[in-house]
Regions:
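Alpha-helical scaffold segments
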Residues: 1-124
């Protein structure tokens, strides 16, 4: 079921926080997602940075300003969000500077500072 949902929508349900507390659990969430009941799943998607980023990229296909501080707390999510939604080119130094500047501004709105540790992307 999760593989089918990922293929159909681009949403990885493993990234959704507290999915067991959703009415109907994971099955109910997947069913509502496939039935395009976005008003029901949006609060659940807003709980974590990865799910917020995926919701903005694959469902809204636009900026989600209310969730940008949550997304900005997670380096990988912000990198993908800024590339797809904000249009930064993360392959160039100028693009990365633009991405980090935008992230810094978003974090400032919630009273956080962008630290070197927060910038560090995992090395796979």
């Amino acid at each position: 079921m999760t593989k089918y949902v990922l293929d159909e929508t681009g949403i990885n349900v493993k990234h959704v926080k507290k999915i067991k507390s959703y009415p109907g659990g994971m099955e109910g969430f997947c069913k509502d997602l496939l039935d395009k009941k976005y008003d029901l799943i949006e609060p659940q998607m807003a709980l974590g940075p990865r799910s917020s980023q995926e919701y903005a990229m694959y469902i809204k296909k636009a900026r989600w300003p209310e969730q940008e501080p949550v997304i900005a707390n997670h380096a990988v999510s912000w990198t993908m969000y800024s590339r797809e939604i904000l249009g930064t080119n993360n392959m160039t130094k100028a693009g990365r500077l633009q991405r980090d500047k935008m992230r810094k501004e978003v974090l400032k709105t919630v009273g956080l500072k962008l630290t070197a540790k927060m910038k560090k992307l995992p090395s796979w």
